[in-house]
Curated annotation (Swiss-Prot):
This is Small ribosomal subunit protein uS4. InterPro entries: Ribosomal_uS4, Ribosomal_uS4_bac-type, Ribosomal_uS4_N, S4_RNA-bd, S4_RNA-bd_sf. It comes from Karelsulcia muelleri (strain GWSS). One of the primary rRNA binding proteins, it binds directly to 16S rRNA where it nucleates assembly of the body of the 30S subunit. The lineage of its organism: Bacteria, Pseudomonadati, Bacteroidota, Flavobacteriia, Flavobacteriales. CDD domains: S4 (cd00165). Residues 92-152 form the S4 RNA-binding domain. It comes from the Bacteria. GO terms for biological process: ribosomal small subunit biogenesis; translation. Keywords: Ribonucleoprotein, Ribosomal protein, RNA-binding, rRNA-binding.
């Protein structure tokens, strides 16, 4: 699967919830899945629910299959609950932190900000969206783009902080499962990959 650049509403309708973070009028009108009406009556198997959950997390964070598989293997090598560690790895990506700090309106926009070299981590420019942050890292926009920063509420709660005077965000600690707001059942993903 290559990077998806098609209609975002179709993806949101497929899962029955907003995936890309923005509210969408066309999603509000048609909350049923896209496609033929006869295809909606087919009974879902357990495998299909597992697959949909995996696709949901990949679309939510903008990750392709190979990179997601590497993240799963990395999570399975660490001590703890695999699914929770997998979500923590997704949440600690630079593009996601830029979105959570409210420096962008969506994750694809955050990804573009990072790849266009507008974001600095600890004073150094980083242009890799999948860059994993460590607790204590400081994230900010480059000097000439600091006026564009949204001074609104953070989308991540306790584990991020934003200083309006210095225009610097701090990744305080890795969030636990209760602090991750995404509606993802990580147990189904672990079961799918553990076959």
């Amino acid at each position: 699967m290559a990077r998806y650049i098609g209609p975002k509403t179709k993806i949101s309708r497929k899962f029955g919830e907003l995936i890309y973070g923005k509210t969408n009028k066309s999603f509000e009108k048609k909350k049923y899945p896209p496609g033929n009406s006869s295809s909606r009556n087919i009974k879902k198997t357990f495998y299909s629910t597992q697959l949909l959950e995996k696709q949901k997390i990949k679309y939510t964070y903008g990750i392709l299959e190979r990179q997601f598989l590497k993240m799963f293997y990395k999570a399975s090598k660490k001590k703890g609950i695999k699914g929770e560690i997998l979500l923590q790895l997704c949440e600690s990506r630079l593009d996601n932190i830029v979105y959570r700090l409210n420096l962008s309106h969506s994750r694809p926009e955050a990804r573009q900000l990072v790849s266009h070299r507008h974001i600095t981590v600890n004073g150094k420019i980083v242009n890799i969206p999948s860059f994993n942050l460590k607790p204590g890292d400081k994230i900010s926009l480059k000097e000439k783009h600091k006026h564009k920063a949204n001074k609104n509420k953070l989308l991540g709660s306790d584990w991020l902080s934003w200083d309006n005077e210095k225009m610097i965000g701090i990744f305080k600690y890795i969030p636990n499962r209760n602090q991750i707001t995404e509606n993802i059942n990580e147990k189904l993903i672990v079961e799918l990959y553990s076959k």
